[in-house]
Amino acid sequence: MKLYNTLTRQKEEFIPLKTGEVNMYVCGPTVYNFFHIGNGRTFIVFDTVRRYLEYKGYKVKFVQNFTDIDDKMIKRANDEGITVKELGERFIGEYYKDADSLNIERATVNPRATEFMEEIIQFVKELVDKGYAYEIDGDVYFHTKRFNEYGKLSGQNIEDLQAGARINVDERKKDAMDFAIWKKQKPGEPAWESPWGMGRPGWHIECSCMAHNLLGDTIDIHAGGHDLIFPHHENEIAQSECRTGKPFAKYWMHSAFLNIDNKKMSKSLNNFFTAREILEKYDADVVRLFMLSAHYRAQLNFSEELLQSAMSAVERLYNAIYNLENLANEVKRNDLNEEEKKYIKKLDEYREKYIEKMDDDFNTADAIAVIFDMIRDINSNVKSDSSKKIIEYALSIIRELGSPLGILQKSTEESVEDEIQQLIDRREKARTEKNWALADEIRDGLKERGILLEDTPQGVRWKRI
């Protein structure tokens, strides 16, 4: 099994530090708002990586943090007249709702920065004591020039970085690229007592500290969005390796951006959709299939057309499952003839192809293509005169290969009901916008499938006809 290591810029054989076990740290959200679907891509990608590692038999300790003290959080809490803690609690709850709706498995641990303040202060103190950090008037900065390998993750030269950083630089710093690991308290900000006075940690030190405390000096996989390579992950490496003298992570993985109109989707550009907005129209299988339809290191363009295409694809997959379930209930023969024994081996070959694709740097796009090839083959070859055993085997392998991707696990009835509700919601939106043609098209399409809509004072109801 190979994965692309951002640190070495090449695919490497995956060999965890401890046989059969994987320690994995993924940078999580700053909890001041709902997460947008661009963040959602990162969370889905590394949920899939975790699921596949577990499918391969690894015991995975998966840590994803919550940044619950941050400039953005302080500003929003002040704007709303609530505490930063109250804001964090609210959006941690909202994160779980949306992540659960996207079928993202809960992390082994979701640490919060504010729970590790004592450990963070000790981390900063050690860096100061070793001469890697310095204090100026209550602020503590990491001295990047003391770390000779600074820039190794992002492939940037420190001299070039410093030249670019000299605009609006804090004159008190020894070098332009030095970054804050402890910030002096400003009026109205939450703060903790430290050897340098009241203050709070910098963002980069929080992740380093939580990873160290929960996973050890060196972890197997550290992951996050592509935008975190520099400066966040670069700074994590610098402060962590200066503290321990050991490599911080063996493998670094980064997911590419989700774009909208060929620009990165982000809150700062105000060109984003929240995961919750998308989930009002599409269910988890659709969103996950869309997100995983491109390799995680390839940028993906967001569009309604692509989501509609993913919805049709998911419908085809569940239709295949539905047809097989009906066949399994109808057929009586249990024995396998020679042709069917050969066909089971053919289905096993699809599994092997799928594993081959996923073993090649988690190539979900090609793995999904294997599933569709297999479905087409099953649709052509598994019929009403087939053995019950082969029908059940076909069903089980479809579910099995969907599992690492987090799809195809619902009952067919659940899937059908979710899809009908999504179409009803789209019809209601069309009616609100006075798009009567689209509303009628959706109603007529459902009627052709044996679903009759009834508009009542209490809302739209549906029944089978």
UniProtKB/Swiss-Prot annotation:
A motif ('HIGH' region) lies at residues 29-39. Its main location: cytoplasm. Monomer. It is an enzyme of class 6 (ligase). One of its GO terms (molecular function) is ATP binding. This is Cysteine--tRNA ligase. ATP binds at K267. Disulfide bonds: none annotated. Its cofactor is Zn(2+). Its EC number is 6.1.1.16. It catalyses: tRNA(Cys) + L-cysteine + ATP = L-cysteinyl-tRNA(Cys) + AMP + diphosphate.
